[in-house]
Amino acid sequence: MVLLQTIAHAKINIGLMIPYKREDGLHEIRSVFVPIDFGDPMEIQIKSLPKGIVSRFVFHSTNHLQGYRHSLFEAVSERGDLSQNILTKTFHKLKPYFQEALEIKVQIQKHLPPEGGIGGGSSNAGVLLQHLFPYTNLSRGEQIQFAKSIGADVPFFLQSSACFVTGIGEVMEPIRLAKGFGILAIPPFGLSTGSMYASLQKSLQKPYGSEVWKSLTEDLIRSLHVGDWVYLQNRLENEFEKIAFQTQPLLKELKLGFFESGAIFASLSGSGSCLYGIYPTEEKRNEALPNVSLRFPKMEFRTFSF
């Protein structure tokens, strides 16, 4: 038996551009994905079963989410319809590839919010796959494609480095990033990824239809290396922000609030609704936390670093 204690980390997006809609109906992206030290603690137990026994999945969870998100997770937990949980779906899809019958038990402390743009479900699935792929014969390339079939962000969570990400999220180039200290805001409302992408109304183009953000320029790479966030602020923007701010004006006020509290970079993460601010030092970040918490009492705030 193998017993693993791990954390499914959230990610933030530093810049997010969607240059075009692909012929397969999915959207091409350009973004820097960064794993942060806020996540869901997970315990994974893997046990071999005797021949003739079918592989099985056991799931237990503690729900730490607030507001409507608490109900969303309950609905797909062992207290609701577990067949709709991303981890259950991941297990059953991977089960035919196991080289032996396995019993997989997962226990999770759920903190990462759905509809937040920080990879709440994708992170859980990615961590589970990391530990189950060794029980298959899938090559690295096949693992990436399998993870992609679970969700566009899932391949990123098979590894732990910040990456420049293209494709629909499966093409990753590791990059070196300066240490950063931030505050993550979790609003009491979510933004549907599907609705946000639909609102972009991107035209259908062939894969070679845009050269924008095809690669990071030397000045952007240097700025990410040294942490020149002021330089990056107006150069790595999230294309979803305009739509998010129109849909939920409080998010625009929140971004301004981060800057007024001393942040040197602030952005929506993914398609939202989570928004974050990055501060010059850990001390400045800690000083800002009570200020933004007081100004936005309905928000949940989490400090993070990377």
From Swiss-Prot:
It holds the Pfam family GHMP_kinases_C. GO terms for biological process: isopentenyl diphosphate biosynthetic process, methylerythritol 4-phosphate pathway; terpenoid biosynthetic process. Its EC number is 2.7.1.148. It catalyses: 4-CDP-2-C-methyl-D-erythritol + ATP = 4-CDP-2-C-methyl-D-erythritol 2-phosphate + ADP + H(+). ATP binds at P113, P114, E115, G116, G117, I118, G119, G120, G121, S122, S123. Catalyzes the phosphorylation of the position 2 hydroxy group of 4-diphosphocytidyl-2C-methyl-D-erythritol. This is 4-diphosphocytidyl-2-C-methyl-D-erythritol kinase.
